[in-house]
């Protein structure tokens, strides 16, 4: 299902009609060293990696009915965002992801896109996490703005810290007990 915000269209990758344009955007964003200044080792080196990622994300939508969206702003794919089913230390959770073109950063687009994706996934009732490199300060800042908080006891590695979305409704219930 396509999501719309005031400025954005979020298109599930399996519903994106122009597969070549989708692959091009994946490659351009994920091979841009500016996108991975915090972790240069993660930069895509071959276009085949973008094709593999596209196929994996398409499969997520087809098999699990949830996944990442291509984020369109003014008719251009400016990034990717959403949640997908993920197993973290044996627990089924939703992993939150966002990656945007450098020219699209700093405009509130990632916040708007991720918020829409989280809102659309709220009915699933699963815990949402974000795995973030501590050196990626813009990503940490965005996660905190969205309500995610550090959960050091669940860290994957020193390079991959876990943030958990705090649910005020659950906290209120816990405080009443």
Tell what function each PLM region has.
Residues 34-56:
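Conserved GNAT-fold acetyl-CoA-binding loop/helix
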Residues 55-58, 83:
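Short secondary-structure capping micro-motifs at structural edges
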Residues 1-37, 68-177:
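Acyl-donor (CoA/ACP) binding surface of acyl/acetyltransferases
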Residues 57-69:
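A short helix-loop-beta-strand connector motif used in the catalytic cores of GNAT acetyltransferases and
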Residues 42-49, 67-70, 135:
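Short, conserved alpha-helical segments within structured domains
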Residues 46, 60, 127-128:
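A generic structural signal for short
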């Amino acid at each position: 299902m396509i999501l719309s915000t005031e400025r954005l269209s979020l298109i599930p990758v399996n519903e994106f009609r122009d597969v070549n344009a989708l692959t091009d955007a994946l490659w351009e964003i994920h091979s841009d060293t500016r996108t991975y200044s915090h972790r240069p080792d993660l930069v895509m080196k071959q276009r085949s990696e973008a094709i593999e990622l596209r196929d994996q994300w398409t499969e997520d939508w087809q098999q699990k009915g949830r996944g990442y969206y291509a984020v369109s702003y003014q008719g251009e794919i400016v990034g990717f965002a959403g949640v997908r089913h993920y197993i973290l230390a044996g627990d089924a959770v939703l992993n939150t992801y966002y990656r945007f073109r450098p020219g699209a950063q700093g405009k509130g687009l990632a916040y708007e896109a991720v918020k829409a994706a989280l809102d659309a996934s709220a009915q699933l009732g699963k815990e949402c996490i974000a795995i973030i490199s501590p050196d990626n300060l813009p990503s940490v800042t965005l996660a905190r703005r969205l309500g995610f908080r550090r959960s050091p006891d669940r860290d994957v590695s020193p390079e991959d810290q876990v943030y958990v979305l705090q649910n005020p409704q659950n906290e209120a219930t816990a405080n009443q007990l």
